[in-house]
């Protein structure tokens, strides 16, 4: 028996109380100057799972997760334009306590958001070119998800999974030889981390979950595996060939268990710098916070990502926001440009509440932790200019 870490089952909270909390925070946003509309949503899941197999394994497990979010909108009626900004709070493997002060400071974020939105609405459009980027974990988690998480699913690398979001450039012949990123890059898969969306005691093949290396000192060293993929390719953790690392998941009894993503995370440097120190080391750059839209090719290689906030960095200082920013690179180019990773104080566990895979399609939730990080010489596009091409 295994139960995830939470304090208050959100389904024990009345609908009236849930609506009241969402309304309270929404009304604070609407009361601020420059906020013309607010969208609020809360998704909550209670998952009870019983598993038994012919080898004698029997497990009973329960997981709880929530995803609250608020989006503030500014409307410039004269120009016919609008700007929006969403809260940065990630989905989490927590209960109702997450909305009332445990794990996230909603009061602080709701108070700060209108000012950031007003600045964003009046910000100049970015001049495209090469910039040094300091990327906050509220943005970087998504880049990890798309360019590392999906790329290191072995079934995808072998071509078993192609119809839903493509295969992978990280093919089996590159294992142990591909310089995925710079020497400061260390990435793990981990289905045991507290409050992770993919965290559980046993996977859907009865395998105990664990932490394992995917990238070590920049070198590609491991895949995410289920039993079928591990056995067929003589791969596994701790030097033991043919052993799953606990990455099987089915979203319902009516679906076969697929190899699904663990909580794939970039590790901080134990004595790494703060966000302010990372910014202080940049002469001309952009500090990026929050995720928005993205695009990546069918091999998980060529991509572009946007964000919520883009703060100019000039001579080590933030000097106001710009807008219409997307950073573009190939996966290995981008991760090899990572010069510095922040320390544990910059670390945040972000994630995706609904990640799709397979045909028939299945949905899984997965977290991605990371520190803030500094990337040198990344190509930045102006999204408005690109749209006009």
Task: Show the residue positions of the predicted features.
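N-terminal small-residue-enriched
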Residues: 1-389
């Amino acid at each position: 028996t295994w139960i995830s870490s939470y304090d208050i089952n959100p389904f024990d909270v009345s609908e009236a109380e849930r609506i009241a909390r969402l309304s309270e925070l929404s009304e604070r946003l609407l009361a601020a100057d420059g906020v013309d509309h607010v969208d609020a949503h809360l998704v909550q899941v209670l998952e009870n799972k019983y598993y038994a197999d012919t080898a004698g394994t029997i497990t009973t497990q329960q997981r709880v997760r929530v995803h609250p979010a608020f989006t503030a909108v500014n409307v410039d009626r004269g120009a016919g334009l609008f700007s929006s900004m969403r809260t940065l709070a990630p989905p989490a493997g927590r209960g109702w306590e997450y909305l009332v002060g445990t794990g996230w400071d909603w009061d602080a974020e709701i108070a700060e958001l209108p000012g950031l939105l007003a600045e964003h609405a009046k910000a100049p459009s970015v001049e495209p070119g090469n910039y040094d980027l300091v990327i906050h974990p509220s943005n970087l988690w998504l880049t990890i998800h798309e360019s590392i998480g999906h790329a290191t699913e072995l079934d995808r690398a072998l071509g078993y999974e192609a119809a839903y979001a493509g295969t992978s450039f990280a093919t089996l012949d590159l294992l142990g030889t591909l310089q995925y990123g710079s020497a400061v890059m260390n990435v793990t898969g981990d289905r045991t981390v507290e409050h992770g969306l993919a965290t559980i005691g046993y996977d859907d093949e009865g395998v105990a979950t664990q932490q394992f290396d995917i990238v070590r000192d920049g070198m590609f060293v491991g895949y995410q595996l289920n039993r079928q993929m591990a056995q067929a390719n003589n791969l596994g953790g701790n030097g033991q060939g043919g052993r799953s690392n606990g990455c099987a998941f089915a979203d319902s009894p009516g679906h076969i268990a697929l190899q699904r993503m663990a909580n794939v995370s970039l590790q901080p440097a134990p004595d790494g710098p703060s966000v302010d120190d990372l910014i202080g080391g940049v002469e001309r750059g952009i500090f990026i916070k929050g995720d928005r839209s993205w695009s990546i090719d069918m091999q998980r290689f060529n991509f572009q990502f946007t964000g919520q906030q883009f703060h100019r960095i000039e001579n080590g200082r933030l000097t106001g926001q710009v807008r219409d920013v997307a950073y573009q690179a190939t996966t290995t180019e981008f991760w090899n440009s990572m010069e510095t990773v922040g320390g544990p104080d910059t670390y945040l566990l972000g994630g995706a509440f609904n990640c799709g895979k397979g045909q028939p399609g299945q949905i899984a939730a997965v977290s991605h932790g990371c520190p803030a990080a500094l990337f040198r010489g990344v190509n930045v596009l102006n999204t408005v200019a690109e749209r006009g091409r």
